[in-house]
Amino acid sequence: MLVKIVLVVLLTLALVFECFSTISVPITIGLYISEYNGYRFGVFGWCKVDRSVCSPIRIGYSKDDILLFNEQEYLHLPNHAKYALSNLLLVHVLAFVCVTILWVFGMLTCFRCIKTSRRMLIIAVLWSMLTFMVTLLGFLIDILIFSSHVTWCTWLTLASAFFTVLSGTVLCVMRRNLTYDKFLESKPEKHGVYVPLCRLNDVEELEIPWCNTMNHQALTAPTPM
């Protein structure tokens, strides 16, 4: 039960943190992944700091957008990045989709039919690895385009990647525990019922056959004269 709670919390944090950078300007004025030269940049466009002008909602920046509003002003990207690089911000959308799917996997582990499926857990572990790589790639793209002008939304993307790794580790632990339980169920019973240590309520419930045999031999052995 505790493992499931930890998994759900980690995946929820990863989803929320990735959502902050995805719904940045111009969708949400208060969230932006970079601020430079009087402009705030987001995944789907940019806005001026005074909120008087915003670009259309789309992937990629274009210098033609600002020229439509003011012919004497030119939109410069931080670090002298090329406008074509801004198309790579699509990775943030892909990362959000991947984290959402992984979050759904985490919710499905609450159901017994999914939790006891080793194949489903393997798929979830592999998907968590893919999600981590895509999320980390989104963070690196922000650093590449905006350099030192990134804001806290970009660092939340890195935190989302970190929580994704932790959730993948928890999924691996769940798969290992499931494999161990399957092994105990399929092992032939030679000396009574096998009880997992984690399910014992009292140490006295654990009966070790070879100890009992040695005690019996000690009791029945003849006493030396």
From Swiss-Prot:
Belongs to the palI/RIM9 family. It comes from the Eukaryota. It is a multi-pass membrane protein. Residues 1-4, 109-120, 175-225 are cytoplasmic. This is pH-response regulator palI/RIM9 homolog 2. It is found in: Cell membrane. The chain crosses the membrane at residues 5-25, 88-108, 121-141, 154-174. It comes from Kluyveromyces lactis (strain ATCC 8585 / CBS 2359 / DSM 70799 / NBRC 1267 / NRRL Y-1140 / WM37). Required for the proteolytic cleavage of the transcription factor RIM101 in response to alkaline ambient pH. Keywords: Cell membrane, Membrane, Transmembrane, Transmembrane helix.
